[in-house]
Swiss-Prot record:
<feature type="region of interest" description="Disordered">
    <location>
        <begin position="218"/>
        <end position="241"/>
    </location>
</feature>
<protein>
    <recommendedName>
        <fullName>Probable N-acetylmuramidase</fullName>
        <ecNumber>3.2.1.17</ecNumber>
    </recommendedName>
</protein>
<dbReference type="InterPro" id="IPR051056">
    <property type="entry name" value="Glycosyl_Hydrolase_73"/>
</dbReference>
<keyword id="KW-0929">Antimicrobial</keyword>
<dbReference type="GO" id="GO:0000917">
    <property type="term" value="P:division septum assembly"/>
</dbReference>
<dbReference type="GO" id="GO:0042742">
    <property type="term" value="P:defense response to bacterium"/>
</dbReference>
<keyword id="KW-0677">Repeat</keyword>
<feature type="region of interest" description="Disordered">
    <location>
        <begin position="287"/>
        <end position="320"/>
    </location>
</feature>
<keyword id="KW-0081">Bacteriolytic enzyme</keyword>
<keyword id="KW-0732">Signal</keyword>
<comment type="function">
    <text>Required for cell separation during growth.</text>
</comment>
<keyword id="KW-0964">Secreted</keyword>
<feature type="region of interest" description="Disordered">
    <location>
        <begin position="372"/>
        <end position="393"/>
    </location>
</feature>
<dbReference type="GO" id="GO:0005576">
    <property type="term" value="C:extracellular region"/>
</dbReference>
<feature type="domain" description="LysM 3">
    <location>
        <begin position="395"/>
        <end position="438"/>
    </location>
</feature>
<keyword id="KW-0131">Cell cycle</keyword>
<keyword id="KW-0326">Glycosidase</keyword>
Length: 439
């Protein structure tokens, strides 16, 4: 997927804006198509179709939009070392709260990124102020299957854009920005030349408390959390734990700590997304072979873990292997190389899709500590045997110059359709250095 440079905004046009947060702008039409002001390429600059002035949606509507995009924004931002609050605020600002034509179905382009995505694009007429005059151009904008892919692509732009002097947006990364304000300041003048761009994002983040989404990508060890565990039946084989979410928690981190799946936590708490909030109470149900009724309460000043007197203890990783994604890597290739499954890789790394990015750190193997649950040990053994068997029957090929899918299918005796399915290819295009399963 080619890196698309987000062009800087035209300062001349900003003199017309009365307020940094003028989300609903009067529209301009040109030959029946939406215009983009100046040399702008982001949806923040996309003029809406002619409508009467609109008032910002009521609180329940804005919160509904925030919740709908946060479900995609948080895991993407977390896995790429970005601030979820900043990414959500950008989506709000760039898409006029999801009301811009480009951000709505069937385009789902929240950030106005130009180019094509998996071969799909939509053309809008744009106007650029060049050499003292307005020039009209037809420009393609990427079309995504959903908001999730739009967030992933925006993260890709923020992480990989490089004009020869290092990553262009590196100062906006969480590793280099101590606060979200530092990240928005780093975007000002680069992602957008509007001098008020960072302030606009900060106001949105503050007004709608978007920092609640800024928990780290894995569970922390803060001393502010607490939980209560109770075995609800004398002869029950389960124990119910009430956990209080603290800063840094994610569903994935909690699931790893307590040895249960994210899906189980979502089901037990009727959660429709992976978004959780500081102070939220979560019911955690774990397997137990104890026949006694026991209860245990951990202090609010503890490390946020419980010590229920049952035979099952939270799963604690003993060791793990982490790799940095390089060109040609795929989840399938990594699963075969490290003798695991795609589902396990996605679970370890809290991924909602099969998309990974160059430079991204991924956990590719993880061994758990001892557990009193013999069932879990048996399952792990069975899984390992199954993975080893599957790996022995496959063949992984590194693409070299001159390779084609047809040639590889002839070499391996596998149909082209099978090779494409195994490697999640949407076209016949393959890249030098790419790893492909061919058998």
């Amino acid at each position: 997927m080619p890196v698309s440079r987000i062009k800087v905004k035209n300062r001349h046009l900003k003199k017309k804006a009365k307020k940094p947060l003028a989300f609903y702008k009067p529209a301009t039409k040109f030959a029946g198509a939406v215009l983009i002001a100046g040399t702008l390429t982001t949806t923040h600059e996309l003029l809406l179709q002619q409508t009467s002035p609109m008032v910002q949606a009521a609180t329940n509507s804005t919160e509904a939009f925030i919740e709908s995009i946060a479900a995609s924004a948080k895991p993407v931002a977390d896995s790429n070392g970005l601030y979820p609050s900043v990414m959500i605020a950008q989506a709000i600002l760039e898409s006029n709260w999801g009301s811009s034509q480009l951000s709505r179905a069937p385009y789902y382009n929240l950030f106005g990124i130009q180019g094509t995505y998996q071969g799909k694009s939509v053309v809008f007429k744009t106007q650029e102020y060049l050499n003292g005059k307005w020039v009209t151009k037809d420009m393609p904008f990427r079309v995504y299957p959903s908001f999730n892919q739009s967030f992933q692509d925006n993260a890709y732009v923020l992480k990989t854009t490089n004009f020869g002097n290092g990553p262009y947006y590196a100062k906006a990364w969480r590793a280099n920005a101590a606060t979200y304000q530092a990240a928005t300041a780093a975007l000002t003048g680069k992602y957008a030349t509007d001098p008020n761009y960072g302030a606009s994002l900060n106001r949105i983040i503050s007004q709608y408390n978007l920092t609640r989404f800024d928990g780290a990508s894995s569970a922390g060890t803060s001393n502010s959390g607490g939980s209560t565990a109770t075995n609800t039946n004398n002869n029950s084989n389960t124990s119910s734990t009430t956990y209080t979410v603290k800063s840094g928690d994610t569903l994935w981190g909690i699931s790893q700590k307590y040895g249960i799946s994210v899906a189980q936590i979502q089901s037990a708490n009727n959660l429709k997304s992976t978004v959780i909030y500081i102070g939220q109470k979560l019911v955690l149900t774990t397997s137990s072979s104890s026949s006694n009724t026991n209860s245990s309460t951990s202090s609010g000043n503890s490390a946020g873990t419980t010590t229920p007197t049952t035979s099952v203890t939270p799963a604690k990783p003993a060791s793990q292997t982490t790799i940095k994604v390089k060109s040609g890597d795929t989840l399938w290739g990594l699963s075969v190389k490290y003798k695991t499954t795609i589902a396990q890789l996605k679970s370890w790394n809290h991924l909602n899709s099969d998309t990974i990015f160059i430079g991204q750190n991924l956990i590719v193997s993880q061994s758990a500590g001892s557990s009193s649950s013999s069932t879990g040990s048996s399952s792990a053994s069975t899984s390992s045997t199954s993975n080893s068997s599957a790996a022995s029957n496959t063949s992984i090929h590194k693409v070299v110059k001159g390779d084609t899918l047809w040639g590889l299918s002839q070499k391996s005796g596998s149909p082209i359709a099978s090779i494409k399915a195994w490697n999640h290819l949407s076209s016949d295009t393959i890249l030098i250095g790419q790893y492909l399963r061919i058998k």
